[in-house]
């Protein structure tokens, strides 16, 4: 089973001193002294990279810890999903809901994670991701090690870790073929 994002963050934090020469507490003091808004995690990561050459995973861990210290609370999966399907994209939510139901029904080893722009579904590794791509389209990203033949699959490098994607414009598009392709991705990533 894949490590949770919190487990991975803890592992990165545990190795910060070895990887960067500073502990998390030392990095948080530097971020605080820099004058950068700790709630702007992108700005903190840019500063860590440009000024200190901090590796990417360490940037994420430090920026996350700085934001949490400033009062930020990570949204729940449902809050991330709600934010993705608001405004002009609110009409796409039923497509997401149909996909999420089909994907999570594959097994109790499927976990759903929250992201700002897409929703990943993970088994041993991410095998599916759902993203509101346009006002009238949801992209279903699937990760294959051996892609099946299907005219609906488009080679892709997103959303998430997808090797292929399918454009969906209605709940009716979440049909038997799409569910079969999701099952193949699930089976190949367990």
Language-model segments: residues:
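Charge-dense, helix-prone N-terminal extensions
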Residues: 1-190
């Amino acid at each position: 089973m894949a490590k949770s994002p919190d487990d991975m963050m803890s592992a990165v934090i545990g190795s910060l001193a070895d990887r960067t020469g500073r502990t998390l507490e030392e990095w948080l003091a530097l971020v605080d002294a820099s004058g950068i808004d700790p709630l702007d995690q992108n700005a903190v990561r840019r500063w860590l990279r440009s000024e200190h050459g901090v590796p990417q995973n360490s940037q994420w861990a430090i920026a996350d810890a700085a934001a949490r210290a400033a009062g930020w609370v990570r949204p729940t999966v449902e809050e991330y999903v709600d934010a993705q399907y608001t405004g002009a994209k609110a009409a796409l939510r039923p497509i997401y809901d149909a996909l999420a139901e089909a994907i999570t029904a594959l097994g109790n080893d499927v976990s759903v994670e929250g992201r700002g722009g897409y929703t990943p579904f993970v088994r041993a590794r991410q095998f599916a991701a759902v993203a509101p791509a346009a006002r009238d389209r949801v992209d279903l990203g699937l990760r294959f090690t051996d892609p099946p033949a299907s005219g609906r699959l488009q080679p892709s490098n997103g959303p998430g870790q997808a090797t292929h994607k399918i454009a969906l414009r209605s709940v009716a598009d979440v049909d038997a073929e799409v569910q079969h392709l999701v099952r193949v991705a699930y089976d190949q990533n367990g």
